[in-house]
Amino acid sequence: HPYSTNHKLAVYLSNRFKNQANFTFFDIEKLPQFSKDLLEEKNTEVDAFRQLILEADAVLFVTPEYDHSVPAQLLNALEWLAFEPFPLLEKPTMIAGASYGNLGTSRAQDHLLDVLRAPQLQAAVQSDGGFLLSRHLKLLMKIMNYLTPRFVKNSMKSCLIFFFL
């Protein structure tokens, strides 16, 4: 959603690191609910999503946390990637998220990490974790205005360097 905290974080990251990488966004809400029965059917949104991931050099998932987990739409999107040609297989992958809560999106990131390491996905997830921003109403407001403190920029930079080597 374009007004969500995590969408704003994703936009910030794409602007901040535009000289190191090209970022492409995909609206996963356009994907139909996953069903193995639909794998044989042609679906332009699913095909475009799978092709985008397949052609990407790396993938960054920016996720909120709902009920201590990942949003259903993201899990649905990952189901579409769990079949040939296995677009996430050994693909450099990072997780990021922002939240107003004390733990940020840590539980969602842990859950997403487990899913991304599943045998059908086997993404090359950054081993030292992703980028997590928590308890930070003022910090989020600054990020939304592109006035982030140095430690936030350095933290994001050290996480994203994984992709730019």
Locate the predicted segments by residue.
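N-terminal beta1-alpha1 ligand-phosphate binding loop
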Residues: 1-20
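Secondary-structure boundary/capping motif
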Residues: 2-5, 34, 69-70, 104-105
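A general structural signal for well-ordered alpha-helical segments in protein cores
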Residues: 6, 10, 46, 74, ...
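A generic structural motif
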Residues: 18-24, 122
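Hydrophobic/aromatic beta-strand patches that form the interior of the parallel beta-sheet core
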Residues: 24-26, 94-96, 126, 131
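Helix-loop-strand module that forms the ligand-binding subsite of alpha/beta enzymes
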Residues: 41-120
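Glycine-rich phosphate/pyrophosphate-binding loop and the adjoining helix
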Residues: 124-165
